[in-house]
């Protein structure tokens, strides 16, 4: 529901992931250079993109004439954050399915075809209903049918490509007045340790997201 801190938590993500490797820095720099990003400078910080929910499918995954990369490519090796997920256009959300599966996006127009990198961590936030509350909240103003239509904007096929879905409750006054939780620096320390353990198990540069069932 509104005020639960889900958007704030997502926007803290840029301070948590491990830095880009040397090869990843070059990948991100090439994308930024190809897009003519103003004021871009090479850095080890991972990209964080948060497009508005009115973005078109072409703006999200790429397209247009001439062909241009979309937000998913600009977020390559970083985070693509979709706030108010169920407010996005259905065709834009559905266009994410193949890139999330393959880590790249194929763009075609007339005789031109380009395959662009799109290996991202997708993070999204959504309310349980159009009014922001959902049927379990006595203050919910939405009809059951309206809530059903709202949630149907996230298809089962796209939901299957989201590894983790977490319900976030609105914090109580008591919890807000209690001891503070972990800060971003502490979380980052745990993430870096977990990444090293994962590299020892899978090999340098490989993550659980890229591991196969075999």
What are these model-predicted stretches?
Residues 4-7, 19, 54, 66, ...:
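Short flexible coil/turn linkers enriched for glycine and charged/polar residues
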Residues 16, 63, 69, 81, ...:
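Long C-terminal interaction/binding lobes of large macromolecular proteins
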Residues 1-40, 102:
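Walker A/P-loop
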Residues 41-80, 112-113:
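Conserved alpha-helical scaffold flanking the Walker A/P-loop in AAA+ ATPase domains
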Residues 8-9, 27, 47-49, 59-61, ...:
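Structured core elements
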Residues 67, 90-214:
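Basic, amphipathic alpha-helical bundle interface domains used for macromolecular binding and assembly
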Residues 77, 83-85, 95-96:
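Walker B catalytic acidic pair
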């Amino acid at each position: 529901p509104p005020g639960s801190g889900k958007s704030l938590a997502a926007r803290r993500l840029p301070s948590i992931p491990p830095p880009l490797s040397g090869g990843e820095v070059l990948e991100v720099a090439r994308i930024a250079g190809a897009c003519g990003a103003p004021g871009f400078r090479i850095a080890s910080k991972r990209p964080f993109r948060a497009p508005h929910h009115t973005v078109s499918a072409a703006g999200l995954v790429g397209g247009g004439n001439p062909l241009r990369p979309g937000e998913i490519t600009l977020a390559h090796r970083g985070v693509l954050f979709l706030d108010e997920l169920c407010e996005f256009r259905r065709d834009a959300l559905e266009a994410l399915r193949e890139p999330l599966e393959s880590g790249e996006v194929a763009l075609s127009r007339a005789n031109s075809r380009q395959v662009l990198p799109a290996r991202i961590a997708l993070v999204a936030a959504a309310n349980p209903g159009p009014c922001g509350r959902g049927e379990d909240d006595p203050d919910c103003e939405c009809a059951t049918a309206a809530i059903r239509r709202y949630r149907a904007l996230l298809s089962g096929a796209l939901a299957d490509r989201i590894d983790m879905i977490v319900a976030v409750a609105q914090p109580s006054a008591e919890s807000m007045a209690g001891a503070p939780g972990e800060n971003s620096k502490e979380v980052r320390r745990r993430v870096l340790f977990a990444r090293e353990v994962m590299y020892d198990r899978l090999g340098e540069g490989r993550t659980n997201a890229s591991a196969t069932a075999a």
